């Protein structure tokens, strides 16, 4: 059975007019009758493309300042009519078939993103006729063609030219999926916006804003299927948020290597987000979602060498992230020294690509340079629900911390404290990080007891022959007891940065003073689970 459907009549009504004139001209060249509305119709007419206004076609004018334009039986009957079934009804009601609809919707997201947008502004940018036509056409995809993305104009014209003015069922079905995805995302945005409006306490206002809507709607697009999930018995896929354009593992382009695994993607995200914290040339090496080596240097090669030195054992099979262009010398140092799963950087020089190409299995990613960080939400799934929170973008500078000990940190200690605090933010709690000269000396991650995380950091440093004496220490949360301070002093730590806030803060500070250590409070915690 031939599933091709000829395009003889099309309705074009778009807010974003990118490419619509050229598309209309191509349809006209194929002998297609064009219907249109408002600004789209004027654009076509002004450029010599024959077009029939929908109001003339239906015999009913646009009313209510354009709120009612296409909501008419001649429009929706023409779209929804089943070919070979509804011809008699169409004839009785003077309805002609409409074979193609190209629609994109009022810019609701752009409107509500504007500073000073009112509820009234938002309401006027809720499209009614557009989504209705989109859904009608997509529902009847067996016979009609829907286009919601300008990027599909050329595809449809090419298919018509190759098929005597017709489209195939395969194409119509694919476009219908895109259409339903489009309207689902649109309605989700509207529901999210309205869901943040809660009854106001003021008599003069009907609502005030809440950060979290009553229902949360989001749409993620599948980027790739994965070989398996966290474990080989789990199936998995990678979905991305196309509304966020910050350089990330989601936007990264893979230049070479084996396909990314579930764990590769998760660990690469951890490494990249950590290295973004640094302005100086920096390298972060991650293993099982925890930084095992972090350092800054005069250049990326020095930063990598120092980061690797922290824990060469754990770096084996790790993920390496940089905050600058990967050069040939740094790439050579990596592939000649260690087995690595993934290397990611904002950009990769051609010489570096050539070096890494010798190791065909190494996954090399280029993510683009980040100018700023996007304000967004973090998700954590629990059985039967989803936890939403602000992304942890909190960070402190030298002017934000409070020295609580008798001894003041030296300038070099304070610099190391700032470095160490940035790293601790990305270590699984309980997190303890030892550092010296802008290089991690030991990392204690994920222990149920904070004092044991401190002990682990010391053990890691000792195993690699690194000297803890006169290093600084960061703790992602406050110390509940002085035992962590005593353990740090015994290891040779000279200075500690921590949030503070324990009911035993005075005892903790006294312990630091007893050991002649400097201690600063950040007033900010960085739990990471």
UniProtKB/Swiss-Prot annotation:
UniProt keyword Protein biosynthesis present: no
Coiled-coil region(s): none
InterPro entries: AICAR_Tfase_dup_dom_sf, Cytidine_deaminase-like, MGS-like_dom, MGS-like_dom_sf, PurH-like
Gene Ontology cellular-component terms listed: cytosol
Domain of life: Bacteria
Pathway terms, separated by semicolons: Purine metabolism; IMP biosynthesis via de novo pathway; 5-formamido-1-(5-phospho-D-ribosyl)imidazole-4-carboxamide from 5-amino-1-(5-phospho-D-ribosyl)imidazole-4-carboxamide (10-formyl THF route): step 1/1; Purine metabolism; IMP biosynthesis via de novo pathway; IMP from 5-formamido-1-(5-phospho-D-ribosyl)imidazole-4-carboxamide: step 1/1
Gene Ontology molecular-function annotations: IMP cyclohydrolase activity; phosphoribosylaminoimidazolecarboxamide formyltransferase activity
Matching SMART domains: AICARFT_IMPCHas, MGS
One of the GO BP terms on file: 'de novo' IMP biosynthetic process
Catalytic activity line of the entry: (6R)-10-formyltetrahydrofolate + 5-amino-1-(5-phospho-beta-D-ribosyl)imidazole-4-carboxamide = 5-formamido-1-(5-phospho-D-ribosyl)imidazole-4-carboxamide + (6S)-5,6,7,8-tetrahydrofolate; IMP + H2O = 5-formamido-1-(5-phospho-D-ribosyl)imidazole-4-carboxamide
Keyword Endoplasmic reticulum: no
Entry domain remark: The IMP cyclohydrolase activity resides in the N-terminal region.
Matches recorded under PANTHER family: BIFUNCTIONAL PURINE BIOSYNTHESIS PROTEIN ATIC, BIFUNCTIONAL PURINE BIOSYNTHESIS PROTEIN PURH
UniProt similarity note: Belongs to the PurH family.
Stated name of the protein: Bifunctional purine biosynthesis protein PurH
Organism: Shewanella piezotolerans (strain WP3 / JCM 13877)
């Amino acid at each position: 059975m031939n599933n091709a459907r000829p395009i003889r009549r099309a309705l074009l009504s778009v807010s974003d007019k990118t490419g619509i004139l050229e598309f209309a001209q191509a349809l006209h060249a194929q002998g297609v009758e064009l219907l249109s509305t408002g600004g789209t119709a004027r654009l076509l007419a002004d450029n010599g493309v024959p077009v029939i206004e929908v109001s003339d076609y239906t015999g009913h004018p646009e009313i209510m300042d354009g709120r009612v334009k296409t909501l008419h039986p001649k429009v929706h009957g023409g779209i929804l009519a089943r070919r070979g079934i509804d011809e008699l009804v169409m004839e009785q009601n003077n309805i002609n078939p409409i074979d193609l609809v190209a629609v994109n919707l009022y810019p609701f997201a752009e409107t509500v993103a504007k500073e000073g947008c009112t509820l009234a502004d938002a309401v006027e940018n809720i499209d009614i006729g557009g989504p209705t036509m989109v859904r009608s056409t997509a529902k009847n995809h067996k016979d009609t063609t829907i286009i919601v993305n300008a990027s599909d104009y050329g595809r449809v014209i090419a298919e018509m030219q190759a098929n005597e003015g017709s489209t195939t069922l395969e194409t119509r079905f694919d476009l219908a999926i895109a259409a339903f995805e489009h309207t689902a995302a649109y309605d989700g945005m509207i529901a999210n916006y309205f869901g943040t409006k809660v009854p106001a306490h003021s008599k003069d206002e009907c609502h005030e804003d809440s950060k979290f809507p009553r229902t949360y709607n989001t749409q993620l697009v599948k980027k790739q299927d994965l070989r398996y999930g966290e474990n080989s018995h789990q199936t998995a896929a990678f979905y991305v948020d196309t509304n966020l354009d910050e350089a990330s593992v989601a936007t990264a382009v893979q230049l070479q290597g084996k396909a990314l695994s579930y764990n590769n993607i998760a660990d690469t995200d951890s490494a990249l987000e950590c290295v973004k914290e640094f302005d100086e040339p920096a390298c972060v090496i991650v293993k099982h979602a925890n930084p095992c080596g972090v350092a800054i240097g005069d250049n990326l090669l020095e930063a990598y060498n120092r980061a690797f030195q922290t824990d060469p054992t754990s770096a084996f099979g790790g993920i390496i992230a940089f905050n600058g262009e990967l050069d040939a010398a740094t790439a050579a140092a990596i592939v000649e020294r260690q087995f690595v799963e993934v290397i990611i950087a904002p950009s990769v020089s051609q010489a570096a690509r050539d070096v890494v190409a010798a190791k065909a299995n190494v996954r090399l990613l280029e993510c683009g340079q980040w100018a700023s960080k996007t304000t967004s939400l973090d998700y954590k799934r629990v059985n039967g629900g989803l936890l939403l929170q602000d992304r942890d973008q909190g960070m402190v500078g030298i002017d934000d911390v409070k020295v609580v000990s008798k001894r003041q940190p030296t300038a070099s200690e304070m610099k190391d404290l700032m470095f160490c605090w940035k790293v601790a933010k990305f270590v699984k709690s309980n997190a303890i990080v030892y550092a010296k000269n802008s290089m991690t000396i030991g990392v204690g991650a994920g222990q149920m007891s904070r004092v044991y995380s401190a002990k682990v950091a010391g053990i890691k440093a000792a195993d690699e022959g690194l000297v803890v004496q006169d290093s600084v220490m960061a703790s992602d949360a406050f110390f509940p007891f002085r035992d962590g301070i005593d353990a740090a002093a015994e290891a040779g730590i000279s200075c500690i940065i921590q949030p503070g806030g324990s009911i035993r803060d005075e005892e903790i500070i006294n312990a630091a003073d007893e050991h002649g250590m400097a201690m600063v409070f950040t007033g900010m915690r960085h739990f990471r689970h």
